[in-house]
């Protein structure tokens, strides 16, 4: 049977047959480990370094990781996908994840591919591929809810930091299924001025009228904002390690995604995949830069279409697979910057 999409849904069979370095952490595992964020899941994967979001300009909406020793800052050296769709707001022009619209509560698995297999996807393939697999549509109607809370009693945190995750959906006898996913976070970390609000809503649909044809679609609306406590000098840390000396720093962003795909499998030796997607992203924030306070709103629009055809054949006693395809991506952005004197007291 041809593979076609090497990433697919990161099933155990896909991972076992993958000819290269590949690790998958599934939902049961990261729930059992008590992982509260994407960073905590990635940090447990061999060859991946995922440092904390700390220092000036850091917040929970960003993601930092590096594979096999590469610079982890904003994960700019790796291709980051969600169900095969690029996560960065400009995957070719600005691949940094200063806004990473991925909530671990909406994921079934985190799939990390290292080595030569990354070449097939790109564009930042030198640092491997990380594909976040969203929660699958249940075969039978189901409603699932879980809540995760964090408390730092010895810090300046005011109350709990809580995340709610919800899944509602199912599949009918005619092969038509859908699911609504939601993950929301409220609260602050152990530092002052670290309040975070995240709302991540995903709607998935799939229709498989026969074994040969399968249609799927997904929409996402992600909206979040976070106060940024910033770094501390040695003297300030000794005085109070929980304080924040940057009361104006704040980041916010939102993203809308729409994607649709078609899979045609006429027989065990052929497979055709067609995927189209559109994303619109806003990222902005206030940053204290000494004498000035800056506001930098940036909007991005990305449109993409990708096709893949795979053909399997036998040569002697060995079986081979040849794939051909194309990718078209169009990116556009609108970036502004405003500033005011820091001593004006106005934003």
Give short role names for the model-derived ranges.
Residues 39, 43-86:
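Extracytoplasmic beta-strand/coil segments of soluble accessory domains associated
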Residues 30, 42, 110-111, 130-132:
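Non-catalytic regulatory/gating segments with a bias toward low-complexity or hydrophobic composition
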Residues 117, 134-169, 189-190:
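Short strand-turn segments of transmembrane beta-barrel domains in outer membranes
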Residues 156-186, 190-228, 250-267, 316:
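Transmembrane beta-barrel wall of Gram-negative outer-membrane proteins
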Residues 3-33, 59-64:
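N-terminal periplasmic "start-of-domain" segments of outer-membrane beta-barrel proteins
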Residues 208-222, 251-347:
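Face-selective signature of the C-terminal outer-membrane beta-barrel domain
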Residues 150-154, 186-191, 197-202, 241-248, ...:
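Extracellular loop and loop/strand-boundary signature of outer-membrane beta-barrel proteins
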Residues 85-114:
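Short acidic/polar hinge/loop motifs at secondary-structure boundaries
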